[in-house]
Each structure stands twice: as structure tokens, then as C-alpha cells.
């Protein structure tokens, strides 16, 4: 069976930007002082890469793992340093129930490999050749965007179930000014992505990091797509979180940037209400979203107590309207949010 991934997207796994070009054995673990884990050695047939290609290989001698930040269906994320700089390392697990989906997730993360924007988590380096200790399909070193996600800010340090589950305690109070600041960060990131022909397709609070400078950065591009790629092949599998998935995607219609606008509207609603979007069984929610235009309630006091609150409600409603073509673009959404921010002074 031919590989589902085009050859042009294969990383040069036999290369590493090492200071020398000596061949060596498989990478090994070297315990460092203070209990940190250093990864020594370089892959076989290692050669020095030109600087312009340094992003598509990892110098494992410069990696120091600090702690595991979390784990998901496709692997684990670690806090680490790379060349002495704080980073996050995502390891795509080899032992998953759906290996093909794991491979797709790895390559999707690299859709943003050469992009730079203040509100997008930057890819520093990536490789399909990893130390044996990881037992992974591939590794991606990313900018360390922060220890906190927007999900944790909204729902508290312990987080909150994204699907059905017990009630959660809210996090810190997010006033309208803070909601708008974070919204402008996120939409600025979306505008840049869409201008590059990329759709995220899994935008939600858990995938938005907040840096020490209080800047939101969009992360986790494992479901992302390049629009130009979709012209040549259908998208058979739609990942992402069902509570934030646009109704046209649930119906199998074409992917457009407007799907991210829908997800943002749900996210903005979460910021302003600090509630979970839906309760009830997943299949019932999916059916109601498509067949009956089910949306989260807009009855919260924040939408009725002031003129700015009412305008925020209008922005949310426009963002999650069912006909995708009627939703605003990221550019128009950014203008509306800036106007509302100016109104608040």
C-alpha cells in the first residue's frame, strides 16, 4: 500500500545540525545533574544541515527534558530546554490505537513549521528520528508558549471537563476588557493563519496558551489543514472537539476558514460566561446542532446588563450562525472587536 504522505513532506531524518558529522550509535539517555534528563548522541549517518534547513532536524545533544506537561491520544508533551532556551517537545506516540491518525497529526503540526506570528506557537525543529527512549513516530520542538491555557484561566487550575461531567468551579473573573484582549490575540492569530491558507480546525480554550506576558498563542495544530491540499483530496476524517466543530463540518461539507470562526465564537462565549457549552449525550448534541441550530445559551447577565455586553452577544451570534458564508471573516471580526475595545476605553 503506498504511503498516504507525499514524499515532498518527508523530513530528512538522516541529517542533524550537529557540530560534527561523525556516525554514532542510537541516541542514549544521559542523566545530568539535578536529575534532569539529557539525550546524547545523534542518529546514524548524521550530517550537518544548512542553516535554512535546521528547523527540520533536531540536535538531541542540546535537548534537556525538565518535566512532562501532559498527554493525549497521540502522545505526550514535555517542558524542556533546547540550546539552553525553554521549549515544549511533543512526542507522537508509536503505540496508539490509530497509527495512521497519529502520523497525520504529526504532519499536520508541521503546517506552521516556517510561520512566525506573535499569536501562534512557533515550531523550532522537528524530526522523524528520535531517541529510542521516546518510542515515538516523531518529535516536534516548539516555542514554550506558557504554563497556563485559556481553559485553565476560565475554569480554574484543575480545569473542567470538555464534555459531559460534574460541574466545575470557575477560574479567575474575566471582565469584558480581558475577554476582548484575549479575543484580539486569538483572532489576530487566526487572521494570519487564514492569510497563509491554513485552517486550525480544533480551536478551543485548551489549545490556547497564555504566556508570562499575558499574550494568547494558538497551539496544537494536529487537526489543521492547508486549503490548497484539500483541493486535490477529500477530507475523510474530521478531528477536533465536537462542542466546537462547525455544523457544516458535521454534515461533511467543504472545509473553509469560517469553521475556525465558529469555533472562536464558542470560545468567546466560554470566556464571557465561564460555562460549559453543552450538556447531554454527544450524539444528541451533534444532531441538535445540525438539525435544530442548537447553540449555548445567551441568557447570561453579561449580555443584557450593558450596551457593550449586547454588542458582544451580536459578535458571538454572527460567529456561530449556521450558514458558513454569513459568518464574518477574521479580518472583519478583528475590526468589530477593536471597535468594541475602543468603546470601552
From Swiss-Prot:
Q: Which GO terms describe its molecular function?
A: ATP binding; MAP kinase kinase kinase activity; protein kinase activity; protein serine kinase activity; protein serine/threonine kinase activity
Query: Do you know which InterPro entries this protein is assigned to?
Result: Kinase-like_dom_sf (IPR011009), Prot_kinase_dom (IPR000719), Protein_kinase_ATP_BS (IPR017441), Ser/Thr_kinase_AS (IPR008271), Ser/Thr_Kinases-Pseudokinases (IPR051681)
Tell me the compartments it is located in: Cytoplasm
Q: Which GO terms describe its biological process?
A: chromatin organization; ERK1 and ERK2 cascade; establishment of meiotic spindle orientation; MAPK cascade; meiotic spindle organization; negative regulation of metaphase/anaphase transition of meiotic cell cycle; oocyte maturation; positive regulation of ERK1 and ERK2 cascade
Domain (Protein kinase): give its ranges: 63-344
Q: Which UniProt keywords apply?
A: ATP-binding, Cytoplasm, Kinase, Nucleotide-binding, Proto-oncogene, Serine/threonine-protein kinase, Transferase
What are the binding positions for ATP in this chain?
Answer: 69-77, 90
SUPFAM superfamilies, from UniProt?
Protein kinase-like (PK-like)
Catalyses:
L-seryl-[protein] + ATP = O-phospho-L-seryl-[protein] + ADP + H(+); L-threonyl-[protein] + ATP = O-phospho-L-threonyl-[protein] + ADP + H(+)
E.C. code: 2.7.11.1
Functionally, this protein is described as follows: Serine/threonine kinase involved in the regulation of MAPK signaling. Is an activator of the ERK1/2 signaling cascade playing an essential role in the stimulation of oocyte maturation.
Family in the record: Belongs to the protein kinase superfamily. Ser/Thr protein kinase family.
What's the protein called, per UniProt?
Answer: Proto-oncogene serine/threonine-protein kinase mos
Q: Which organism is it from?
A: Sus scrofa
- Corresponding gene? MOS
Amino acid at each position: 500500500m503506498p504511503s498516504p504522505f507525499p514524499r515532498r513532506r518527508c523530513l530528512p531524518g538522516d541529517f542533524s545540525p550537529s557540530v560534527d558529522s561523525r556516525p554514532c550509535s542510537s541516541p542514549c539517555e544521559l542523566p545530568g545533574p539535578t536529575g534532569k534528563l539529557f539525550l546524547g548522541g545523534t542518529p546514524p549517518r548524521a550530517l550537518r544541515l544548512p542553516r535554512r534547513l535546521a528547523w527540520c532536524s533536531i540536535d538531541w545533544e542540546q535537548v534537556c527534558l525538565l518535566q512532562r506537561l501532559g498527554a493525549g491520544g497521540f502522545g505526550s508533551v514535555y517542558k524542556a530546554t533546547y540550546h539552553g532556551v525553554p521549549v515544549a517537545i511533543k512526542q507522537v506516540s508509536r503505540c496508539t490505537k490509530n497509527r495512521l491518525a497519529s502520523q497525520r497529526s504529526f504532519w499536520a503540526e508541521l503546517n506552521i513549521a516556517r510561520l512566525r506570528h506573535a499569536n501562534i506557537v512557533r515550531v523550532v525543529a522537528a524530526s522523524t528520528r528520535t531517541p529510542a527512549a521516546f518510542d515515538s513516530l516523531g518529535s516536534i520542538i516548539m516555542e514554550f508558549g506558557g504554563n497556563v491555557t485559556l481553559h485553565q484561566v476560565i475554569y480554574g487550575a484543575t480545569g473542567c471537563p470538555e464534555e459531559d461531567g460534574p460541574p466545575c468551579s470557575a477560574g479567575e473573573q474575566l471582565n469584558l476588557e480581558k475577554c476582548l484582549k484575549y479575543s484580539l490575540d486569538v483572532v489576530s492569530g487566526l487572521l494570519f493563519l487564514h492569510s497563509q491558507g491554513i485552517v486550525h480546525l480544533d480551536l478551543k480554550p485548551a489549545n490556547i496558551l497564555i504566556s508570562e506576558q499575558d499574550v494568547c498563542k494558538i497551539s496544537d495544530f494536529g487537526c489543521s489543514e492547508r486549503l490548497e491540499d484539500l483541493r486535490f483530496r477529500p477530507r475523510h476524517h474530521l478531528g477536533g472537539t465536537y462542542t466546537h466543530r462547525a455544523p457544516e463540518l458535521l454534515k461533511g461539507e467543504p472545509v473553509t476558514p469560517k469553521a475556525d470562526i465558529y469555533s472562536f465564537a464558542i470560545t468567546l462565549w466560554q470566556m464571557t460566561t465561564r460555562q460549559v457549552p453543552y450538556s447531554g449525550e454527544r450524539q444528541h448534541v451533534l444532531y441538535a446542532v445540525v438539525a435544530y441550530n442548537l447553540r449555548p445559551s445567551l441568557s447570561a447577565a453579561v449580555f443584557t446588563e450593558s450596551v457593550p455586553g449586547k454588542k458582544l452577544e451580536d459578535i458571538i451570534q454572527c460567529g456561530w450562525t449556521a450558514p458558513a458564508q454569513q459568518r464574518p471573516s477574521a479580518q472583519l471580526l478583528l475590526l468589530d472587536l477593536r471597535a468594541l475595545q475602543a468603546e470601552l476605553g
